[in-house]
Amino acid sequence: MRYPRDLQGYGATPPDAVWPDGARIAVQFVVNYEEGGENSVLHGDAASEAFLSEIVGASAWPGKRHWNMESIYDYGARAGFWRLHRLFTERDMPVTVYGVATALQRSPAQVATP
């Protein structure tokens, strides 16, 4: 049975892309905005976030807030986002945001920022 995904792509003969100013590569910056979209009893979830975290081996806390987990997400919204925004804005660099809808809904100041 043939594997259904194309993992070869163009192979050894990629198309001859012509980029502006003789550039040899194109880079796209993508920021994931998830802060406020994580599992939390505050959001009506049965337990705290356990999966999307830098806490190794984190487990959900049923019916309780996980203060360390919330702190990680809070930092992203309160400080991390603004640091990245300044860096990209100062350099006039375009950026793509992959945002969790509920996270964006809970962060109107970040969403309204040009």
Locate the predicted segments by residue.
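Catalytic alpha-helical scaffold of carbohydrate-active enzymes acting on polysaccharides/glycoconjugates
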Residues: 1-114
